[in-house]
């Protein structure tokens, strides 16, 4: 299974090495994000490959290159920040129960791992056969959370690409994606419920919409900035679109006019090989816009003229009024319920009446403010507009409509009253102290 759905292939033809994809105009709708991965190989997988750490390392690097290729459709660059092989013993108890193992791995990351290394998302690769033939599991929307920014994946196929699809699928869940439904018209795409005999390297339009909505509502902080070269574990084969220690440029193709494929050094006369501020092997002139402002809460960045990199993505201070005082800036966006309703239910949607939100004081699976130890915590009366989002249609204002997924909760930073916003604990807090 993938996340509890049956695996249905018997064989798979050898796949060609993943090729690099150029960004399409469609991908420009997503802001650039960077995910630093920590990969942990359990002792069972170490034993499976006869203790050959070099073979395992090469296999993991190939997986990362495939993941990076697939994530380009979301304008995400993935880097291997940490690779740890548990050659002596497992550092957690890897059980046949996938939910239990995921919980243990998340707790270990929060209490042990984050104290000794920096990364954004951790995955455990295991040889353990999980109950129900599950091959992967991850929390939906857990990215950047100390305990929930994790996934577990069984090394279930000899073909690297097939396992990499599963790893990308689980990371997709962490980024807010749910399984593709029938209406998505893509039964082989990355977020499909079932991993097909020939899995696709593409995200469906449904997945892209989910990611865009979730990114707008949450704007994960840990994946905003590009990794340093010293943050990246060097790969045996270059051409991964990442600059690693010792490289001037990424030497993936001998045809690259800026970069010498044999040495990963710049060709004579070249200032740069790639980057938002690199044009025809030269630094773009100072003042050239390299990242447009995506909202009135964001700040456009311009090239400095001395580097190929676009400056760090910056934005106006949190709490600054926006959209004619209908909202407050939060991490470069202006989250308001009206636009969240449109994202969920279309252009005829608007915010539901105040009475709809009173359901959030029930403490139900769908109507609550928080969840603690599997118990749903009801919203306090003053916090009901920070729980489940209720919408309606302009032609039927008495309707209380909601989306029961994670995307259906009111986004953090959303205005819940005059001078107040929803904080990370789903409380309607003073805008001056909420962040």
UniProtKB/Swiss-Prot annotation:
Protein name: Zinc metalloproteinase/disintegrin
PROSITE patterns attached to this UniProt entry: ADAM_MEPRO, DISINTEGRIN_1, DISINTEGRIN_2, ZINC_PROTEASE
Organism: Craspedocephalus gramineus (Bamboo pit viper)
Domain Peptidase M12B span(s) in chain numbering: 33-227
Required co-factors: Zn(2+)
Binding site for Zn(2+): 169, 173, 179
Activity regulation information from UniProt: Inhibited by EDTA.
Pyrrolidone carboxylic acid carried by residues: 27
Coiled-coil annotated spans: none
């Amino acid at each position: 299974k993938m996340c509890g759905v049956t695996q249905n292939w018997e064989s798979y033809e050898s796949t060609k090495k993943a090729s690099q994809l150029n960004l399409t105009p469609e991908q420009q709708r997503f802001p650039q994000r960077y995910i630093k991965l920590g990969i942990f190989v359990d002792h069972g997988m170490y034993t499976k490959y006869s203790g050959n750490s070099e073979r395992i390392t090469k296999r993991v690097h190939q997986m990362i290159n495939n993941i990076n290729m697939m994530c380009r459709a979301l304008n995400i660059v993935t880097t291997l920040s940490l690779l740890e092989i548990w050659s002596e013993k497992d550092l957690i108890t890897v059980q046949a129960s996938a939910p239990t193992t995921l919980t243990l791995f998340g707790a270990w990351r929060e209490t042990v791992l984050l104290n000794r290394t920096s990364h954004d998302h951790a995955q455990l690769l295991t040889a353990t056969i999980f109950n129900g033939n599950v091959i992967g599991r991850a929390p939906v929307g857990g990215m950047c959370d100390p305990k929930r920014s994790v996934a577990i994946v069984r090394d279930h196929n000899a073909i690297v690409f097939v396992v990499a699809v599963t790893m990308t699928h689980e990371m997709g869940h962490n980024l807010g994606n749910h399984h593709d439904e029938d209406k998505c018209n893509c039964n082989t795409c990355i977020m499909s419920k079932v991993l097909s005999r020939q899995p696709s390297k593409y995200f469906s339009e449904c997945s892209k919409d989910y990611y865009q909505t979730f990114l707008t509502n949450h704007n994960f902080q840990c994946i905003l900035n590009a990794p340093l070269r010293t943050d990246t574990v060097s790969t045996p084969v270059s051409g991964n679109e990442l600059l690693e220690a010792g490289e001037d440029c990424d030497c993936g193709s001998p045809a690259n006019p800026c970069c010498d494929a044999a040495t990963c050094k710049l060709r004579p006369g070249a200032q740069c090989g790639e980057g938002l501020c690199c044009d025809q092997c030269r630094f773009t002139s100072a003042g050239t816009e390299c990242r447009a402002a995506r909202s009135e809460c964001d700040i456009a960045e311009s090239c400095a003229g001395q580097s190929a990199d676009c400056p760090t993505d910056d934005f106006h201070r949190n709490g600054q009024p926006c959209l004619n005082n209908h909202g407050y800036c939060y991490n470069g966006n202006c989250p308001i319920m009206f636009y969240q309703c449109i994202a969920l239910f279309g252009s005829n949607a608007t915010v539901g009446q105040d009475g709809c939100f009173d359901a959030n004081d029930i403490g139900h699976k769908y109507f609550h403010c928080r969840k603690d130890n599997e118990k749903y915590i009801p919203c306090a009366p003053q916090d009901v507009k920070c729980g489940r989002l209720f919408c309606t249609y302009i032609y039927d204002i008495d309707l209380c409509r909601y989306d029961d997924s994670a995307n259906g909760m009111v986004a953090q930073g959303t205005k819940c009253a005059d001078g107040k916003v929803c904080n990370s604990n789903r409380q309607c807090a003073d805008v001056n102290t909420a962040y």
